[in-house]
Structures are given as structure tokens and as C-alpha cells.
């Protein structure tokens, strides 16, 4: 339903936008509800702005019994819109910015009287001004309906609304979201559509629209959340690979119904009692556990990949940057030991900022512990380990199990490094070329075996496993 928006404020000098009419303690009570009750009705409003009427003519009868012209000042506020849809039905739209209240009422009788009151007031002020000052000094601001063209009036309303949106409604409100996000469809003329611009300082797409849209980190285009997972978190506009959660990667890689997680109840206990002036370590752990639904920065377990039993660990960058603490190291070590005992191939998907500083040397020790378990797995048991490096893989993970795979696979354009660019530049006092820590550049230097896009990422390890003697269970049972 297309809705039409009228916003104006009556002042001594001119007719200015200040969002129409509102509640009054001295008059009728809540606008659009003469009974005095307040029943919120949630609805939306379009951002196509028109004048209140196409012809600009109004009747001013049957008004005095509601309120006189002098009483109209008590109705002026910043909080109410007069709205008319394409069917001619009228509404009053009230919202309180501070308390984020949004109400709509469609009492047609009251609104018709309200509309007439405005017309009556404008006509009386214009006529009085004409008599007192004469034709030459007559202020036409008070009679835009009678003398201004429709185009001029629309432009006036557009500029007022545009100014108001930028100056007043910079809050986390569904009203502002709806106005700024709805398309221009339904607008009959260019002059009647409001033009708004949004900058990152007061309008965060990810915060306000996270449940609907995902913003690309590269081109800043919006991807519809409903289809984003089915496209494996790849931007539709530029093809950029956005981060995936560990749960999404498990769903992508593991056959349905075969996932058996390990050590889900293992959590960090702040072993060195790390304290920060900003936020205690335990509070940070609790926060990320609530926001991600995970207990730690890695998920480990046993599953099947195209029918082949495997042991897999998937790191999650959303949990404290995927940092490796004592729990992460212990879970990965136990996974490798389980795979060693059961002669299973291992996949570890890396996405980490490195060792967790809140656990000091205990986090650094995990590098040696995991590497020791991998040495026994690879060298003594002659089993097969595939390392998959995603963006970002840095620090202690790069310096340990990330680069120890029998086959090392990287995602396209993944950021892979030991130290970050700023650290290197500040330490060596040299400028690091752009792209020198990207997967493609490092691949040509011989650091990886493969760069594999996400679409075939499940099939490639499956073929590698079969090449190394790991076959699907149905084929093993077939030959028995």
C-alpha cells in the first residue's frame, strides 16, 4: 500500500517542517484517538513524500467544536505524521524517538477535522495578513496551498523531510530503517521522492540489518542473508570470500547425520588469572560463548566426508579471533590422538589470529603440543593430514599445525602470515608490498600445494583421501 506523507509546523514566520501534530495535555489526548486510550498499532511508512492533497483545496467546517484556531498550537510537536494512502484513507502516525514508540490510528472523522483545521488556520492567517499589510507585503508562506504550484510545495516538503531525517532520526529504530531501505517503487514523479544519503558513522548496515543482509568487506555490497549460506558466503557482486562460521563449515564438509562432536564441555578457566583494565578475561569468554553459541574457538569431532570417516577440527574466527589457548590446543591434540588410535585421516580448517595472549606461555605451549601429536600421527603411524588455510591464518597457528599438513590447501585470496603487515613494517622499518601475504602470491613461492575454491572444497579432500587409501565405508563393506 502506497502511503502519502504530510509534515509541517505552523510558526509566526513561515510554514516549516517539524513533523506535524502530536499529543496535547490541554486538548483531546492522544492524537487520532478522541477517547483518550492509547493502543499501539505497528505499521510502516513509505519514503515517497507528497503534499497532503493533490488539488490543495480544503473545507473548514465543523472544526470549532473540536478546537479553535488558537488551540492548534498545543498540537504542534515533532512526533506525528498525517498520512493518506492511494485509496484516500487517512491515518495519523505517531512516534516517540526517545522512547521508540510507534502508533498508527485511522479515525477518519477525527482526521478529516484535523485536516480542515490546518486549512482553516492557513486561510485565516493568510487573509488576516492580507488585510493588515496589503497585497504588496502579503506573506505567501501562509498560503502555499492557494498560491504555490504543486511542484514548489513538494520540493519544500522534500527538503524539510530530508533535513529532519538527517538531523533527528539517527537512532536504532525500525522506522528509520524502513524509510532508508525501501525502494523507490511507487513514486510517480522524481520531485516526490526523498533523497537521502547514509554514511558509516551513523548508519551501520551490519548492526541494523544483520538478520536480513550481509555486507561484503571488499565491495560493500549487500548479500541477502537467506541465500548467502547456500552461496557459501561468497559475495554475489565481486566474488569475495567472506568468513564462515565453524558450524557452517562443518555443515558444508560433513555428510548429514554423521557429525559426532568431541569435548564440547571443555572450557577455559583463566589459568594465569589474566586481568585487563577494560574487561576481565572470564567476562570476554562468557561474552563470546553467548554471542557465538560455542564453548571455544574450535569445534572438533568425527564425521564422514562423502562416506569416508574422518577426524576434523574447524577453528572459528568469530570466537576471540580464533585465538589458540590451552583449551583449543587440548581439543586439537585429543582429536589427533583419537584419529591416531582409529587410523582416521585428519582435516584441520585454520582461521586464527594466533596464540591467545590472555593465557601467556600456556598458549604458546600448545604449538609444541599439537606439533608433537602430529609427528606421532604422520611419521610413526604414517597417516594422512590435510591442512586447510582460510582467511586469516596468522601467528602461532601458521607457525605450527597450519603448515604441517601432508597436503596444504588454501582458499582464494586468503590472508596468511606469521606476523601482520604493521608489525613487520614497524619492526624492519620497511614497506611490505600489497598482496605479499595473500594466498596467490604465497602459492607461487611454493608455500601451498593447492588453492581450492569453496565450491569443490568437499570433493578435493575426498579424492586425496582415496588416493592415499581411505575409502568410503560402503565400498569397504562391499569388498569384505
UniProtKB/Swiss-Prot annotation:
GO molecular function, one term: acetyl-CoA carboxylase activity
Keyword Zinc: yes
Key words, A-Z: ATP-binding, Chloroplast, Fatty acid biosynthesis, Fatty acid metabolism, Lipid biosynthesis, Lipid metabolism, Metal-binding, Nucleotide-binding, Plastid, Transferase, Zinc, Zinc-finger
One Pfam family recorded for the sequence: Carboxyl_trans
Residues involved in Zn(2+) binding: 216, 219, 235, 238
Broadest EC class assigned to this enzyme: transferase
Names of the cofactor(s): Zn(2+)
Chemical reaction(s) catalysed: N(6)-carboxybiotinyl-L-lysyl-[protein] + acetyl-CoA = N(6)-biotinyl-L-lysyl-[protein] + malonyl-CoA
Keyword Coiled coil tagged: no
PROSITE patterns the UniProt entry points to: COA_CT_NTER (PS50980)
Record's cofactor remark: Binds 1 zinc ion per subunit.
Compartments, as annotated in UniProt: Plastid, Chloroplast stroma
EC identifiers of the protein: 2.1.3.15
Zinc finger (C4-type): 216-238
Subunit annotation: Acetyl-CoA carboxylase is a heterohexamer composed of biotin carboxyl carrier protein, biotin carboxylase and 2 subunits each of ACCase subunit alpha and ACCase plastid-coded subunit beta (accD).
Functional note: Component of the acetyl coenzyme A carboxylase (ACC) complex. Biotin carboxylase (BC) catalyzes the carboxylation of biotin on its carrier protein (BCCP) and then the CO(2) group is transferred by the transcarboxylase to acetyl-CoA to form malonyl-CoA.
Family: Belongs to the AccD/PCCB family.
Protein name: Acetyl-coenzyme A carboxylase carboxyl transferase subunit beta, chloroplastic
Organism: Illicium oligandrum (Star anise)
